[in-house]
Amino acid sequence: MIIAVDGPTASGKGTLAKALAAHFGLPFLDTGLLYRAVGRHVQLHNGNPDDPADALAGCDFPDSLLDDAALRTEEVGGLASRVSIHPEVRAALNKRQVDFANQPSGALLDGRDIGTVIAPHADVKLFVTAPAEVRAQRRYDEMQRHGIDVRFADILADIHARDARDMGRVDAPLKPAQDALLLDTGDLTIGGAVQAAIALVESRLRKS
């Protein structure tokens, strides 16, 4: 069984994807982490994430970089969004994701284009979203808990900028697959969102 989970930044898709993978006993890949590693590798080598050649060179990152705590920062998240617009970068990372999706044990992948590009044959495709203001508030609250001084307006502006890049790129834009199940987490608690996601997946599996 393959489950594809897509959605914009701070929609809650990562939390839901991990919970679904645990519930259904599937290997899990956070594909966004790969793009963050590319962005971080470019940063560490003083490259330009907006330059296709520098971004492509960033794909040659060591596996150890996937354990770098900096990958989870807002700054590196922004770099990931910037390198991901380059078709060369997406092509370089696609094979790793496709191979993971097609392993015999099944898989759950979370990203931006899993249901549309990486695993269009997935048994279940879930598109997780929430209003930009709600996503910005979540990110703001998270950063406040970690003692990071930031303005809500700046977080919201960054969310809008990332959405525009993700949805507007020519290659594999962020959008729900035609047969994706839509889940808006805007008014849901984490527990409520997890239960709703499990129910949606189980409902689709019963019909297939």
Which residue ranges define each predicted feature?
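ATP-dependent small-molecule kinase phosphotransfer cores
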Residues: 33-106, 116, 133-137, 141-145, ...
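P-loop (Walker A) phosphate-binding loop of NTP-binding proteins
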Residues: 8
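Conserved lysine of the Walker
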Residues: 13
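Hydrophobic positions on the alpha1 helix immediately C-terminal to the Walker A/P-loop
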Residues: 16
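Phosphate-binding beta-loop-alpha motif at adenosine-nucleotide cofactor sites
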Residues: 124, 174-190
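Hydrophobic anchor at the beta1->P-loop junction of P-loop NTPases
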Residues: 3-5
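Post-Walker A helix-loop "phosphate-sensing" segment adjacent to the P-loop in P-loop NTPases
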Residues: 21-31
